[in-house]
Amino acid sequence: MEEYQVYLELDISRQQHFLYPLIFREYIYGLAYGHYFNGSIFSENVDYDNKSSLLIVKRLITRMSQQNHLIISANDSKKNQFWGYNKNLYSQIISEGFAIVVEIPLSLQLNSSSEEAEIIKYYKNLRSIHSIFPFFEDKLTYLNYVSDARIPYPIHLEILVQVFRYWAKDAPLFHLLRLFLYEYWNWNNLITPKKLISTFSKSHLRVFLFLYNFYVCEYESIFLFLRNKSSHLRLTSFSLLFERIYFYGKIEHFVEVFVKDFSSTLSFFKEPFIHYVRYQGKSILASKNASLLMNKWKNYLIRLWQYHFDVWSQPRTIQLNQFSERSFHLLGYFSNVRLNLSAIRSQMLENAFLIKIVMKKLETIVPIIPLIRSLAKAKFCNVLGHPISKPLWADSSDFDIIDRFLRICRNLSHYYNGSSKKKSLYRVKYIFRLSCIKTLARKHKSTVRAFLKRLGSEKLLEEFFTEEEEILSLVFQRASSTLQGLYRGRIWYLDIIFSNDLVNHE
């Protein structure tokens, strides 16, 4: 009965757009507690029951409610200090509770109409990792120019909070959220982007991710709207993106002049459409048009960040390159387009001649050095790539230890299965296998050689050596016509069922 009452209370709060009372409900932090300690494949199964208590969380929330959070000054973080116990642990749990509550108005607005439901369906497809990989494989080889850029972080947290203010109709919730963030980070001065990125990467607060996604969503809503409008310009007389930076001005006279005097120039801008891909904080712009058009989009992005979001970005941070000249880093891969030269001998009557054909081929390579650095940070190996044991896992059973290593190894294998060269992937598998063996040997207080000799490595770790094709996975066959007939290849990215945590350490 209590469970139904909880859902009824949540539904009433959604309908009334008044979420402030939910902040002080204990069950919210019960949900947050479970989410926080089960959110990553690299999480340690430590007994947190001795370190935390929902009663303490409730006291902290009650103490927050007794403060004057409707008025915030620069010195509030010194006067209103309510952290007493395990600061990192309880701040994480409270932030998870805040994230659960502040996500409610977003889900309410997105489900309020069929039109908005279509919008969120479009954006889900746009941001799906299963749609990015096929885009790279199918489209990238036909494009000429790529511009990769990291979306700049706001210089101050207040920018993120104000973006959320546009959506939230609950003023007390907005002020309490701001108070919590000021208390947690002790924001007396402006935070530099370097410090903000460092804080974000270390804490991984869900509420910060939520606010940052709001910030990125607003940026993309403006940029993609203009991009979609520009793609339709070629269907009318407004086919010019030439010298256009401010998109809201009237350009009838502009088009008339250029069509009359520079008609020969318009052939370069018949298709101003560009492709946009974004994963986490990095975005890629790609086009098959001239570099001049891509430079115009680059300048527009910089002005959009500077004037609309008050975020400073240097023009050199967005680099424009040809695919054949430079590789780029996205989704944990190093990717580039390589030109393959081939010669075909053709004979016509008595004359024979050679035809040279240039074909583009997409190459995706696993960046082994950043990956080993991430594995070293997760304590699977040292900085040189030599496998080490996991002492925190040595207290588990043999089956649990093998299952943990096997699960992580399979997730990474599925994620990097699209690599053109498998040598780096084999090295990663070797690190996990030997790290697993060393952990088991540490548990049984034996050397690796003696442990393998006593138990037998083949039977104990046979699942590690199982071929990927024999593992039950979501694999379909894709047919493509080639010169040799019908080729059946694996759609490898459908195997990805878990986000790659190591991509966050790029």
UniProtKB/Swiss-Prot annotation:
Its main location: plastid. One of its GO terms (cellular component) is chloroplast. It is found in: Plastid, Chloroplast. GO terms for molecular function: RNA binding. The keyword Chloroplast applies. Pfam families: Intron_maturas2 (PF01348), MatK_N (PF01824). Keywords: Chloroplast, mRNA processing, Plastid, RNA-binding, tRNA processing. GO terms for biological process: mRNA processing; RNA splicing; tRNA processing. InterPro entries: Domain_X, Maturase_MatK, Maturase_MatK_N. Belongs to the intron maturase 2 family. MatK subfamily. Usually encoded in the trnK tRNA gene intron. Probably assists in splicing its own and other chloroplast group II introns. This is Maturase K. It comes from Spartium junceum. The gene is matK.
